[in-house]
């Protein structure tokens, strides 16, 4: 059985990608890099990033339809929806396509209610303590990316 793992809002260099690519039955669709954090983008950068992320959602939908995975993991889709980088319509099309073949996992904070009702799994990791908060450390190579 096949697994499709697709990322949103990441730069394609995250540490989990290397590990995931070692799994024979997993197809990894890395995020198309966006320039910086959404909260720090100009209006023009947000518009361009949203176009790119919506196009990526359509590409992932096509990948799911071709691969027919038993499990599709949509990493950070919840965040992409919450910050307006992916439209509800595009997310629904992607989720529906993936659900036709198996289960769907959608990760990230702020999942909208409609997605929580629709997806098979919705997960969110909450940082109770993190050096970013306590020591004002930036993301570190080998740890956060």
Residue positions per predicted region:
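Phosphate-binding/switch loop-helix module in NTP-utilizing enzymes
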Residues: 40-100
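Conserved nucleotide-binding/hydrolysis micro-motifs of P-loop NTPases
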Residues: 9-12, 34-36, 78-80, 110-113, ...
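Sensor-1/coupling segment of RecA-like P-loop NTPase cores
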Residues: 94-112
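Phosphate-binding/switch region of NTP-binding enzymes
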Residues: 109-145
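Conserved ATP-binding/catalytic motifs of P-loop helicase motor domains
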Residues: 6, 104, 131
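Conserved P-loop
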Residues: 1-65
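Short, well-ordered beta-strand core segments
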Residues: 72, 104, 122-124
């Amino acid at each position: 059985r096949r697994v499709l793992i697709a990322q949103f809002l990441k730069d394609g260099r995250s540490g989990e990608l290397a590990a995931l690519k070692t799994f024979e039955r997993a197809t990894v669709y890395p995020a198309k890099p966006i320039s910086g954090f959404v909260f720090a983008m100009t209006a023009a950068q947000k518009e361009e990033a949203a176009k790119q992320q919506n196009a990526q959602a359509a590409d992932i939908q096509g990948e799911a339809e071709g691969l027919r995975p038993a499990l599709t993991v949509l990493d950070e889709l919840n965040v992409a929806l919450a910050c307006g980088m992916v439209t509800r319509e595009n997310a629904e099309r992607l989720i529906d396509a993936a659900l036709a073949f198996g289960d769907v996992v959608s990760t990230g904070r702020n999942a909208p209610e409609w997605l929580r009702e629709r997806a098979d799994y919705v997960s969110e990791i909450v940082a109770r303590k993190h050096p970013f908060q306590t020591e004002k450390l930036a993301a570190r190579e080998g740890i956060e990316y």
